[in-house]
Amino acid sequence: MTTSASDRPEAGVDRKLLDILVCPITKGPLEFDAARQELISRGAKLAYPIRDGIPIMLPEEARKLG
């Protein structure tokens, strides 16, 4: 199975993966921030980093939002 370039945002993260990921704390939706390479959870006020195209969904690795 191949993934076309149109299925990938700038970081190389598969768009389908982003569609199914949820915040591990709130189980709510995540927003992709392409500029910062983060997945934002508004409910938990956390930003999960994306490193080398891999979302790091560990709360202890997340950045707290103001």
Curated annotation (Swiss-Prot):
- Family annotation (InterPro entries): Trm112-like (IPR005651)
Gene3D superfamilies named in the record = 2.20.25.10
Pfam families to which the protein is assigned, alphabetical? Trm112p (PF03966)
The record's GO CC annotations read: cytosol
Source organism, top-level taxon = Bacteria
Q: Which family does it belong to?
A: Belongs to the UPF0434 family.
Q: What is this protein called?
A: UPF0434 protein RPC_0266
